[in-house]
């Protein structure tokens, strides 16, 4: 049972492409986006429009509150069950998204990583408070450079987890994943074929800049302000990972008085470009993908 996956860096057009293909083939779309799953994050997560949601059956859009954690492991389990249920109904399904851990968990089941160790996590958290995230990130770059390239240094929950795994196991996340990928896969009725949109970097950056401007015109500032007012305490203590997201963090800093609005918008564009680079690194190093130009006859690959 082959399941097509459409991925690519943010703003590459994968959502619009998946939607068009779903309309042409009668498929349902399973979103592999770790932010679109949350109801409160709409404009900043570039969700499909209301019209698109009416036209095609989407899964994992607006299904959780930001106070409800939804891990990559939980996504992989539930997504697998839904794919099988969709197939049982005789329908096609397309997986579309660019969230690294969601994709990897679904397509290449995770290596067995150890549970959190409270004592090691406490020690690392103290080091984070004393030394700062930059020094811990440099430590990870020395120990596991491939994993470090896929991380946003400002999102310390994944940084701490990566260092914690090294301390617990004596092995890096990259080593553990490589060991897993070298083992025989358990029998499964699902086979994923992953296509990635290959877009020139200059064009991608132009699209990122244009999309940021469109988001601001659509009301991203108001959306971020509503989140700021409702979750100010959680934002300040970084207890809601869903809000540690490009597009919102920069506007939260604007509300703190640290930047002008124009500076915040420029930072959103810059940080989104950085995020796209990390996505590309992940896709090239951790996924088996078929890169295809955006102007490819994609329909032929999904109807054959």
From Swiss-Prot:
User: Top-level EC class, please?
Assistant: transferase
User: What catalytic reaction does the record list?
Assistant: adenosine(37) in tRNA + dimethylallyl diphosphate = N(6)-dimethylallyladenosine(37) in tRNA + diphosphate
Provide the GO biological process annotations: tRNA modification
The cofactors named for this UniProt entry are: Mg(2+)
Which residues hold ATP?
8-15
Q: Which GO terms describe its molecular function?
A: ATP binding; tRNA dimethylallyltransferase activity
- Reply yes or no: does the keyword Magnesium apply: yes
Q: Where is this region: Interaction with substrate tRNA?
A: 33-36
**Which E.C. number(s) belong to this protein?**
2.5.1.75
Q: Which residues bind substrate?
A: 10-15
Instruction: Give UniProt keywords alphabetically.
Output: ATP-binding, Magnesium, Nucleotide-binding, Transferase, tRNA processing
Instruction: Kindly list the residues the record flags as site (Interaction with substrate tRNA).
Output: 99, 121
Q: Does the keyword Transferase apply?
A: yes
Its quaternary structure? Monomer.
The UniProt function text for this chain reads: Catalyzes the transfer of a dimethylallyl group onto the adenine at position 37 in tRNAs that read codons beginning with uridine, leading to the formation of N6-(dimethylallyl)adenosine (i(6)A).
Q: Which family does it belong to?
A: Belongs to the IPP transferase family.
Protein name, UniProt field: tRNA dimethylallyltransferase
């Amino acid at each position: 049972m082959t399941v097509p996956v459409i991925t690519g860096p943010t703003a590459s057009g994968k959502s619009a492409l998946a939607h068009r293909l779903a309309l042409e083939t009668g498929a349902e779309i399973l979103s592999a986006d770790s932010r679109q799953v949350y109801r409160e994050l709409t404009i900043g997560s570039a969700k499909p429009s209301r019209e698109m949601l009416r036209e095609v059956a989407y899964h994992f859009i607006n299904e959780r509150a930001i106070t409800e954690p939804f891990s990559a492991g939980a996504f992989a389990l539930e997504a697998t069950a839904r794919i099988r249920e969709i197939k049982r109904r005789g329908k096609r399904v397309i997986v579309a998204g660019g969230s690294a851990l969601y994709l990897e968990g679904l397509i290449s089941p995770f290596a067995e990583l150890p549970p959190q160790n409270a004592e090691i996590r406490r020690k690392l958290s103290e080091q984070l408070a004393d030394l700062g995230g930059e020094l811990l990130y440099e430590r990870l770059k020395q120990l596991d450079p491939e994993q470090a390239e896929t991380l946003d240094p400002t999102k310390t929950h994944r940084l701490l987890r990566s260092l914690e795994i090294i301390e617990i196991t004596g092995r890096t996340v990259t080593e553990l994943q490589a060991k897993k990928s070298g083992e025989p896969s358990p029998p499964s009725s699902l086979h994923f074929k992953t296509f990635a949109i290959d877009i020139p970097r200059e064009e991608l950056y132009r699209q990122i800049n244009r999309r940021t401007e469109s988001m601001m015109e659509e009301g991203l500032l108001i959306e971020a302000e509503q989140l700021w007012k409702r979750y100010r305490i959680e934002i300040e203590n970084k207890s809601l990972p869903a809000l540690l997201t490009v597009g919102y963090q920069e506007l939260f800093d604007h509300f703190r008085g640290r930047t002008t609005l124009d500076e915040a918008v420029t930072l959103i564009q810059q940080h989104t470009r950085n995020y796209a680079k990390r996505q590309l690194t992940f896709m090239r190093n951790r996924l088996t993908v078929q890169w295809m130009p955006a102007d490819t006859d994609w329909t032929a690959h999904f109807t054959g």
